[in-house]
A protein has these predicted regions:
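Substrate-gripping "pore-loop 1 plus following alpha2 helix"
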Residues: 34, 39, 155-171
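Conserved lysine of the Walker
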Residues: 17
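P-loop NTPase motor core
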Residues: 1, 9, 26-92
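Substrate-engagement module of ASCE P-loop NTPases
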Residues: 87, 123-134, 161-182
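Conserved P-loop NTPase mechanochemical-coupling segment
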Residues: 67-74, 78-121, 149-158
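The conserved Walker
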Residues: 12-13
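Conserved P-loop NTPase "ATPase switch" module shared by AAA+ and STAND
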Residues: 135-159
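Hydrophobic positions on the alpha1 helix immediately C-terminal to the Walker A/P-loop
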Residues: 20
Length: 183
């Protein structure tokens, strides 16, 4: 069975999408030891599946739920903050000898919220490339509330600007990305 590269889960609000993605992140993340968490559940009976997938892949899990603002600059600042917080969870990457030096420099800027717009737009694919270099495995990308920045922008009058930012950020991460296992 071929796994689709990108899957979009569309369900109503309060349907459990965030919980499901959090569970998937715990299951896949190579930095976790989730055996006890899933012990006794039906999935733990699938030994081959667990051997192949449980804690076997670098996993990026982020949410855009807080990227909101009455003006574009505020929303962009919250997007920078979201990426900075994500970088803080992966600071081990800048200690590695196998990670590109230029990426490390950009990573530091993203982490301190000192990046420019193109660096912010390329942040997810850059993080994925760093993780792939570090682990020598493709990355599983889980994005929650991906539509919030654009929906909030639409209701606050900066739709075009936010669409440009999010389109660049997501298309580079999701389309023709060799560091992507699936999203």
């Amino acid at each position: 069975n071929k796994i689709p590269e990108v899957t979009l889960i569309t369900r109503p609000r309060r349907f459990g999408k965030t919980l499901a993605m959090s569970m998937l992140a715990s299951f896949f993340d190579i930095r976790s030891d989730s055996k006890k968490l899933f012990q006794g559940l039906n999935i733990s009976k699938e030994q081959q599946l667990c051997n192949d997938w449980m804690n076997q892949y670098p996993t990026l899990f982020l949410s855009f739920k807080d990227v909101d603002g009455t003006i574009f600059e505020n929303a962009l600042g919250l997007l920078q903050f979201t990426i900075a917080e994500l970088c803080k969870k992966h600071t081990y990457l800048i200690e590695s000898d196998v990670v590109d030096q230029d990426d490390k420099e950009t990573f530091r800027k993203l982490k301190s919220m000192g990046s420019n717009l193109p660096e912010l737009q390329g942040s997810i694919i850059m993080l994925m490339n760093m993780m792939k270099a570090y682990y020598n495995k493709p990355v599983i990308l889980l994005i929650d509330e991906y539509d919030v920045p654009i929906a909030k922008a639409s209701s606050n009058g900066y739709y075009k600007e936010m669409l440009e930012v999010m389109k660049a950020m997501l298309s580079t991460a999701l389309k023709d990305n060799e560091a992507l296992k699936f999203a």
